[in-house]
From Swiss-Prot:
Part of a membrane-bound complex that couples electron transfer with translocation of ions across the membrane. Required to maintain the reduced state of SoxR. This is Ion-translocating oxidoreductase complex subunit G. The keyword Ligase does not apply. One of its GO terms (cellular component) is plasma membrane. The gene is rsxG. InterPro entries: FMN-bd, Ion_transpt_RnfG/RsxG. It is a single-pass membrane protein. The chain crosses the membrane at residues 9-29. NCBIfam families: PRK01908.1, rnfG. Its main location: membrane. It comes from Salmonella typhi. Its cofactor is FMN.
Length: 206
């Protein structure tokens, strides 16, 4: 009887150990898959704001952390695009703190001469049917920044039409597009200062 119990106990212990090991392997594989999918989604998003033919480095591995009031409160990531090792542009995470329903998160592709290469909203809580037209899937409004140049802090073109600028506001919703226009402008101006900052920036993960 004792031998039988001992045998069953050993069998259960081995089964438990095997199950634990299998679970660990599956979890690791799942984490790797999720991480790979996240990188692919990020790469696809980057392609929307920075033409791939402008750079030839691994953009996702050229990540830096910055604390800049121009980009909003807290730490934001900046990805530096290089062509043959020369910095040529950046993808900048930015926050518009003054959306109608809270902060709006963006990524902005820009060169170092004040030209916006692309913009996408990555997170927001704006009103459905009104402010949510900042999403690319709902409207092409966000694409109108591409190719626009900022001549300086006082560039009056960088405002919604209601404020005398060049960008459309939405019917019944001016606060949301105004917040995005201003955030993109600030990010574009910040991009001009990046080349001088590069030697002093902290790499992501450090």
């Amino acid at each position: 009887m004792l031998k039988t119990i001992r045998k069953h106990g050993i069998t259960l212990a081995l089964f438990a150990a095997g199950s634990t090991g299998l679970t660990a392997v599956i979890n690791q594989m799942t984490k790797s898959t999720i991480h790979e999918q996240a990188l692919q989604q990020q790469h696809a998003l980057f392609d929307q704001v920075l033409p791939p033919d402008r750079y030839n480095n691994n953009l996702q591995e050229s990540c830096y952390l910055v604390d800049a009031p121009a980009l909003g409160k807290g730490t934001h990531r900046v990805f530096i695009a290089r062509k043959d090792d020369k910095p040529v542009a950046a993808i900048i995470e930015a926050t518009a703190p003054d959306g109608y329903s809270g902060a709006i998160q963006l990524i902005v592709g820009a060169d170092f001469n004040g030209t916006i290469l692309g913009t996408r909203v990555t997170e927001h809580h704006e009103t459905p049917g009104l402010g949510d037209k900042i999403e690319r899937r709902l409207s092409d409004w966000i694409t109108h920044f591409s190719g626009k140049t900022i001549s300086g802090e006082n560039d009056t073109h960088w405002a919604v039409k209601k404020d005398g600028g060049d960008f459309d506001q939405f019917t019944g919703a001016t606060i949301t597009p105004r917040a995005v226009v201003n955030a993109v402008k600030r990010a574009g101006l910040y991009a001009e200062s990046l080349p001088a900052q590069l030697p002093h920036l902290t790499a992501c993960g450090e």
